[in-house]
Amino acid sequence: MSIKPLPAILFATATALALTACGSASTPSAPTASAKASSAAAADPSTAPLRGIVIASTEYNSDNTTDTITAYDPTTGEVTATRTFTVPSEYTTYTGGACEREHCYSPDFERVLAIDTSGGNERVAVASSDGSFTLLNDLIPVPQGSRSYSNAYAKFGPDGSIYVAHEDKPDDGDFVGTLYRFASETEAPEAVPTTFTVSNTQDFQILPDSTPIAIGYYAWAANNSGIGCYGALAVTSDGTCLTVDKDAVYSKKGKPLSQTTESDKSLRIEEWTKVNLPNLEGTHEIVKTLRLSPDGTRMALLAPFKKLEDDMSFQLYSAPVGGGEATQLTKATDIAGSKHIILAWSE
């Protein structure tokens, strides 16, 4: 076996590397069209995925109502994605009546329910991020000899279906209530059986398994194990319910829905424990909206200053679920409008 001297080996290696480098430099690879399109799409907030801390705000104008959904980076507070919905002025979103809080929005946040309560028979419509606006009333069947009386409540279900509580008034009889499910806003609905009487005075909620239940003023919230509380805004994996009341966050141990009583359906804040957030107490108004981080250790809060002259915008904070110093996401400076809700904190 012959052994080459070290200088010869180094010279050969250097020559090979130089040739390789020249060959590589002579044929540079240009970005493909798909790569450019992907990069442009990622930079466009109107089409980027709604991930991070997702907040909806509603602005009522003289000629329309505008809903804006904005996703913020949970580390920096920078805007990563947006969606805008504009509906006629006679319609409202996030009404607190026919449609309440997060149930006004589809699970993917690409659609929002809009309700017109100006007439005797409420009109229910769906506004989409693609600009479409679809009225659902015309798809609801009205029995012969009856008239459509009320579409009192409307909600999105966990699978994106739309549920509408509808009442008919026969010419010679009492009101008849039916809960309708729309698989989409372009398909005729199907009637859904319920264990409660559907009426324009009975609110309802759709559980994660798509079961409808009657509710009063407070909705049921639970974790993935089914442990929760009425009136909770979020529930941790260990079954701790969290809510906001009187400018403070409160916690309480939850229970399965099957073990709740009528008294549990009311929010008795004296039965809850205040969560200590020292740098917000006394100076900030904590808005009644809250979402947990994907790992369940922190909560996202909206907390504007109590004195409007201090700051007209809403500050976005995250804080440990058990209490402690709240951290402001200082770059989230454009949160404005008259109604706000944190829809999600997702990865």
Where are these regions (language model features)?
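C-terminal motif of bacterial Sec signal peptides marking the signal peptidase cleavage site
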Residues: 18-21
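Bacterial signal peptide processing site
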Residues: 23-25
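An edge-strand/N-cap motif at the start of beta-rich repeat modules
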Residues: 32-81
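Short glycine/acidic-enriched loop and turn motifs that connect beta-strands
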Residues: 59-64, 117-121, 167-174, 217-223, ...
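Short loop/turn segments that connect beta-strands within beta-propeller blades
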Residues: 74-77, 127-131, 182-187, 236, ...
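Beta-propeller fold detector
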Residues: 78-87, 133-141, 189-196, 237-245, ...
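Repeated scaffold domains used in trafficking and secretory/extracellular systems
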Residues: 88-105, 144-155, 197-207, 233, ...
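Hydrophobic beta-strand positions that form the internal "hydrophobic ladder"
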Residues: 112, 162-163, 212-213, 241, ...
